Structure formats: C-alpha cells, structure tokens
UniProtKB/Swiss-Prot annotation:
Gene Ontology BP terms: DNA catabolic process; DNA strand elongation involved in DNA replication
Similarity comment text for this entry: Belongs to the DNA polymerase delta/II small subunit family.
NCBIfam families referenced in this protein's UniProt entry, alphabetically: PRK04036.1-2, PRK04036.1-3
PANTHER family named among the record's database cross-references: DNA POLYMERASE DELTA SUBUNIT 2
Protein name in the entry: DNA polymerase II small subunit
Biological source species: Pyrococcus furiosus (strain ATCC 43587 / DSM 3638 / JCM 8422 / Vc1)
Catalyzed reactions: DNA(n) + a 2'-deoxyribonucleoside 5'-triphosphate = DNA(n+1) + diphosphate; Exonucleolytic cleavage in the 3'- to 5'-direction to yield nucleoside 5'-phosphates
One GO cellular component term: DNA polymerase complex
Gene coding for it: polB
Keywords tagged on the record: DNA replication, DNA-binding, DNA-directed DNA polymerase, Exonuclease, Hydrolase, Multifunctional enzyme, Nuclease, Nucleotidyltransferase, Transferase
Subunit structure: Heterodimer of a large subunit and a small subunit.
InterPro entries: Calcineurin-like_PHP_ApaH, DNA_pol_delta/II_ssu, Metallo-depent_PP-like, NA-bd_OB-fold, Pol2_small_arc, PolB_N
Enzyme Commission (EC) number: 2.7.7.7, 3.1.11.1
GO MF term list: DNA binding; DNA-directed DNA polymerase activity; single-stranded DNA 3'-5' DNA exonuclease activity
Amino acid sequence: MDEFVKSLLKANYLITPSAYYLLREYYEKGEFSIVELVKFARSRESYIITDALATEFLKVKGLEPILPVETKGGFVSTGESQKEQSYEESFGTKEEISQEIKEGESFISTGSEPLEEELNSIGIEEIGANEELVSNGNDNGGEAIVFDKYGYPMVYAPEEIEVEEKEYSKYEDLTIPMNPDFNYVEIKEDYDVVFDVRNVKLKPPKVKNGNGKEGEIIVEAYASLFRSRLKKLRKILRENPELDNVVDIGKLKYVKEDETVTIIGLVNSKREVNKGLIFEIEDLTGKVKVFLPKDSEDYREAFKVLPDAVVAFKGVYSKRGILYANKFYLPDVPLYRRQKPPLEEKVYAILISDIHVGSKEFCENAFIKFLEWLNGNVETKEEEEIVSRVKYLIIAGDVVDGVGVYPGQYADLTIPDIFDQYEALANLLSHVPKHITMFIAPGNHDAARQAIPQPEFYKEYAKPIYKLKNAVIISNPAVIRLHGRDFLIAHGRGIEDVVGSVPGLTHHKPGLPMVELLKMRHVAPMFGGKVPIAPDPEDLLVIEEVPDVVHMGHVHVYDAVVYRGVQLVNSATWQAQTEFQKMVNIVPTPAKVPVVDIDTAKVVKVLDFSGWC
C-alpha cells in the first residue's frame, strides 16, 4: 500500500482516488505533511479527503492542483452502463407519449426483465422537465456526513479555532430549594424501556477479502437495511383487510388480463405529470411503473409520500408493463384500536427537548424557573395538583449545544467546551426532584454519532449525566412504556425531509409533518436527504407498533396534534433565536412545557416560561 494512503489510514482518515492523484506528488515532494492535511480536514468537519477538500487545501498552501490523466472510465468500475429504455403508457385513451426512463441499480431486487414495449400515450407532460438537476451533496444545503475509519457515519469533528478563553458558569453553585410546604403524591414507579437501539443485536456484513470494490461493505449494509424495511412494513400493510390478492412484482406478468391485483414495495421514484403521478415501485423480485390518475381519491395522499417509503397500490396490470392503480395505501395507523384500561390514579409526564446548554441563547432563567416549578414553587391550585403528580420527565435530544456543529458556532457559545457543557447540564438536572425519573435521548447537537439511529451519548463526553441517579439514558429513537402507555421518543430530524419534500408543510407547524411520518410508520424514511442514516443491517427506524404518544423536538417550535387517537407532540426548545436561525428563518417558541396525562395519553396543559427567556 502507498505510504501516503497508509499514513492517512493510521490517522483514521480516508481519501478518494481523485484526491489521491491531486495530492500525492506534492506530498512526495515534502510540500505538506500528513498532520497538516489531517488538521485541515478536521477543521472542515470531514474524515474523508475528497477532491474538493484536496483542491481547497492546495489553494491554502499556495499550490496548483495537479490533475490526473483523463481516462474513459471512472476510478471504480460499475460494469457496463445501462441503456435507456422507452415506454408507452395507455389509460383509457389513445393519445401518445414517449418518456425516457433510466433504470438505476437496485438495492433490494434480484432484477426483472426490462420492458421492451413502448407505452401508449396519455398526453402526459412532465412538470419541471426543463429544470436543471441539482446535486444531493453539500451544495444544496444538506449537512456533510462525517465517517469513521470503517466508513460508518458518525458525529463530530470539532472546529479547531484558536481564541481567547471564555469565562462561564457550570451551575456548580446553583441552589433550588424544594418548597417545604409542598406535598408530593406517592406514586409507584411503573416504566419499561420497550425498545432501545443498544438492545438490538446486529451482525454487520464483513468484507470477504481485501480485493473487493470500494465501498462494497457499505452497499451491502444498506441493501440489508432496505430489505429489512420492506419486510417489516410489508407485514404491517398485509394487516389491512382491504389489501387482497397481493402479488410479487416479478410475478405480475403471469396475472390475468383485467385482474385486479395489489403490489407492495419501496418507492424508488415519484414524478408528477399532467394526468397524475408515475411511481417506480420495487420489491425483492423486481420493479414496475405505477400510474395513479389525478381523479383518484388517494391522489393527495400519494402526492405527499417520500422516496424510499413502503406503500401499496391496487389496480390492473397491463402487459405493456404498467400497473394502472385506482387505490393507494400507506402502512398508517389503524382506524380502530383496542382501548387500554384506565389507571387507578392520575400521573403526569413532562415532555421537553432541545435544551442547548452552552449556547448564549440558552434560556437559563426560564429553565431555572421550570426547575423551581418542579420543586413545588407553583402559583395556582391547578399547577399544584399537576406538579404533585409529575412522575416522569422525557427529554428528546439536543440537551447541549455541542461544539463544531455548524460554521461559526463558537461565537454563539457561552460554554465552548463540550465536557463542561455536559457537566453544566448535569448540575442543572440534579435539581430535578429525585422521585421524578428522567429519560434522556441524544440529538444531532449532542456528542453522539451523527447518523441515526443514535445508540446513546459518547460516555467520555457525557459522563456527568450518566451519573445522575434518577436518569435513564435512551437511544434515538426509543420506546418507553409508562403505566401501560407507549411513548415513542425521537429527536425529529425526519421532519426536515418531509418539510423539504411536501409543499405546504413547514417547520412552523411541525405536528403535520410528524403525522406524515406516522402514516409512513417510519422516523426518517428518505435516504440521501438531509438526515444521515447509518448503514445498519436492520432498519431500526420503522415504527413497528403504534404508540400512544409520539414525542419529537429538533425544529424548536411547539405543536401538538392528535391523529387517529395518537398524541403527537413537538416540545419546542429552551433556546431563543440564534443568528444562524435568523438566516434560515427559524422562529422558535422557547420555554413551552407540555404536560401529558398518562391515563389518557393526551396533553392536558402547556406551561409557559417564555416570560423569563
């Protein structure tokens, strides 16, 4: 192995072939050292030396990039390029169209015979056909994915900025006395962590030899993940009594003409045309084009579905290779569910998220007022009744502001040290009364791997919160059962992909995109969007059982909606608007605290501490 590459691997850094050719000659001439290159890459929050990063590094060093000799092929062969195939479609008319369809390599199917026939026209003109495609990298506002030495996405390459030290408090001297005249109701603890990522035994694929294609192990892991997703969600869809005569896509060519069939598969692509929507759907046996007309009663629901979601269509298969659908189905929540027996006494859970300790916009005074409230310093009889029966506090991620999460973050921090941020958080949470059990999950600002699911915090950074005796650390996502009611806890990054893909949905009303995620029964279904997904061999983001409460955060805006009996809550934040949020038009609603009656699994009150924010 080349000494240059070997040195980078020892430092846990990867390099792309194009970047290697740009840098190798200058490295051999002694123009820069491995240490300089690694420091530069780390400052750019990347563990992979790409050609763009290499070019930028050379410019900083005052060196001209040396371009590699052009070749006809790529650096890594993917085999022969696939030919474009032409299709014709018909749907009750004789109007003609022709559309070019590029077939991509399948993650999950074993392949199906390419369709040779051209489809009859339905007078369809693609919307946005003349628009230029935009790459799905960092250019379009997505977050850079950072990888560890095995190629797995992980969290955090902190910014290395030499600045003057800041003086700050870690709340060591904070005292919040419990109201001596306040009496708490003794309620027996009854909780169980039903699902936690750490409790799932995964067997990642192994490289058989060192001569495999670049990234082969990652591709196989993602293929396994999508097969797992399809299997889990197919099982949920099959529970719908309306789905009869389900046929594998690879067997569609054997169905009788005009026979109504149902298919279940992953959404590879979705396109809007003049007369409806065209999907490419894939299962383990093959792929098929599906046309859903605009006059279908399910058109609006189908329009909102994300790529990589698992759906079902019912319709008639044409021998020309198209399924003409008249019904569309999501895994969704059943219309009727068995009611759970009532509890013998009232007990409440508090939902919060996005505390962002360490940020200069952290609403310190408001959070201290909240802690005082938990300690019995209340103003009304109603609040006294509620706080006396609060038994659980659930925190859905971003408990600290982190370090190096976004460019220029250092200027927004009062506590610039990640260790001290967690110590400050632990000092604050130590004032939560000991009879209240806290559940704490990580988010994208926390010291945890960036890709979801996030198993837990990195203990070397977050050790202080692990020492809290009344704290239970959970994964993102996780399911906890409180007195027989299931709470799905997820930080909520999947909301970003829904808002970015479905017109009319915004961050300002996060309850609606949360409903869409629940309908798809997945925390973050879209692959390659704004949310990095870890290449686990099993999809742990599927919502396999319908919860009673879905609790998310991330978008810093409070909202609560009920969908088919399920209470969905976004618990906002404890951070006022930052300069970065102003630039991206995020208007937070800080210091809102929803209180959930565990018996009914519904929000019964929203406390407002924003007056101290």
